[in-house]
């Protein structure tokens, strides 16, 4: 699959195009230009390192939305075995913007739940662009309760612009569905490990992300509103999105510093979309480490730990005195 380059990656795109051109010439020529190709490849790699070492929050937001970025089902295929998808909320419908089902993680039975976007126009419409309606969140709740009943750890994968804001979703109780999920997750008797893999958009993300461990991929985002939405409210124009992204503090490193997430999972050079298998391998190791800490922990200990964790959000902390 040919890589799609973002606007700020155009210098890299130009180098990669030159490399491809030289490779094509080498195939049809007796002249050996492999050294020049290697030199340009090294230059491209260094340029990628330099650009990705100095990303702005707005650029990170663009990477989190990259159309080739791995989605939940991509990770399910690489990380889990024996995945069996479960459908429907048993109340209204089956929302395909959230997928979930039984699987095995390193041989252990578990429940997997996540947002799912689409790759092409037809699939994006089918998945509602990764924006769940109430039936999607109620499906997730049903699967969480099923996992709780059978003592299965839960892995959730967050990647949504936000909950669907349509009239039909509001009529069917969007806020109630999200709120009920928060209530259920807070009281689970099994560990829940949440990973923000792309966009973490407001309550639509939080509805499957009240975890005992919350981790983010290096170039994922997590915020109460999109940069464009914030800019439209504060400055009446979406053109101020870069400034809004800075103010929102939506990057993994910023959120880790604030204590809102627990771990950051490094991504391959150039982002997760450059190396699906490499990204999945790193994420699998991180998930295994997170799950291991709950081995032998009683339900009482697990819930007490979660209770303390949730109460710690938003605590005011004195850092010094002023004269």
UniProtKB/Swiss-Prot annotation:
Q: Which pathway does it take part in? A: Lipid metabolism; malonyl-CoA biosynthesis; malonyl-CoA from acetyl-CoA: step 1/1
| Compartments where found | Cytoplasm
Reaction(s) the record says it catalyses:
N(6)-carboxybiotinyl-L-lysyl-[protein] + acetyl-CoA = N(6)-biotinyl-L-lysyl-[protein] + malonyl-CoA
Q: Which residues form the CoA carboxyltransferase C-terminal domain?
A: 39-293
The record's annotation in SUPFAM superfamilies points to:
ClpP/crotonase (SSF52096)
Would you say which domain of life the source belongs to? Bacteria
In terms of one coarse class, where is the protein primarily found?
cytoplasm
Alphabetically ordered keywords of this record:
ATP-binding, Cytoplasm, Fatty acid biosynthesis, Fatty acid metabolism, Lipid biosynthesis, Lipid metabolism, Nucleotide-binding, Transferase
Q: Which GO terms describe its molecular function?
A: acetyl-CoA carboxylase activity; ATP binding; carboxyl- or carbamoyltransferase activity
GO biological process terms, alphabetically, are:
fatty acid biosynthetic process; malonyl-CoA biosynthetic process
Q: Which NCBIfam families match?
A: accA, AccA_sub, PRK05724.1
Q: What's this protein's function?
A: Component of the acetyl coenzyme A carboxylase (ACC) complex. First, biotin carboxylase catalyzes the carboxylation of biotin on its carrier protein (BCCP) and then the CO(2) group is transferred by the carboxyltransferase to acetyl-CoA to form malonyl-CoA.
Name the family.
Answer: Belongs to the AccA family.
Q: How does it assemble?
A: Acetyl-CoA carboxylase is a heterohexamer composed of biotin carboxyl carrier protein (AccB), biotin carboxylase (AccC) and two subunits each of ACCase subunit alpha (AccA) and ACCase subunit beta (AccD).
Protein's name according to its UniProt entry: Acetyl-coenzyme A carboxylase carboxyl transferase subunit alpha
Q: Whose protein is this, by species? A: Cupriavidus necator (strain ATCC 17699 / DSM 428 / KCTC 22496 / NCIMB 10442 / H16 / Stanier 337) (Ralstonia eutropha)
């Amino acid at each position: 699959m040919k890589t799609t380059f973002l606007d700020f990656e155009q210098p890299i795109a130009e180098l990669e195009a030159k490399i491809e051109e030289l490779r094509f010439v080498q195939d049809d020529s007796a002249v050996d230009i492999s050294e020049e190709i290697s030199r340009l490849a090294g230059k491209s790699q260094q340029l990628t390192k330099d650009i990705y070492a100095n990303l702005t929050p707005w650029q990170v937001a663009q990477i989190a939305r990259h159309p080739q970025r791995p989605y939940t089902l991509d990770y399910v295929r690489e990380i889990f075995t024996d995945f069996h998808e479960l459908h429907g909320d048993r109340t209204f419908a089956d929302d395909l913007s959230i997928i979930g089902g039984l699987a095995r993680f390193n041989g252990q039975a578990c429940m997997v739940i996540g947002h799912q976007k689409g790759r092409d126009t037809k699939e994006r419409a089918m998945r509602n662009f990764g924006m769940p309606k109430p039936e999607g969140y109620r499906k997730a709740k049903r699967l969480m309760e099923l996992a709780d009943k059978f003592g299965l750890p839960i892995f959730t994968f967050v990647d949504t612009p936000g909950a669907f804001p349509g009239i039909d979703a509001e009529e069917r109780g969007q806020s109630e569905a999200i709120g009920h999920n928060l209530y259920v997750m807070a009281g689970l008797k099994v560990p829940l490990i949440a990973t923000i893999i792309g966009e973490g958009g407001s309550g639509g993300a939080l509805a499957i992300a009240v975890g005992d461990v919350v981790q983010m991929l290096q170039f994922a985002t997590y915020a109460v509103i999109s940069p464009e939405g914030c800019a439209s409210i504060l400055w009446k124009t979406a053109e101020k999105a870069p400034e809004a992204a800075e103010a929102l503090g939506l990057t993994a490193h910023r959120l880790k510093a604030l204590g809102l997430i627990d771990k950051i999972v490094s991504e391959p050079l150039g982002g997760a979309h450059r190396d699906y298998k490499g990204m999945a391998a790193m994420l699998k190791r991180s998930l295994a480490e997170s799950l291991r800490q709950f081995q032998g922990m009683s339900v009482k200990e697990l819930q007490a730990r979660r209770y303390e964790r949730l109460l710690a959000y938003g605590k005011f902390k004195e850092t010094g005195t002023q004269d």
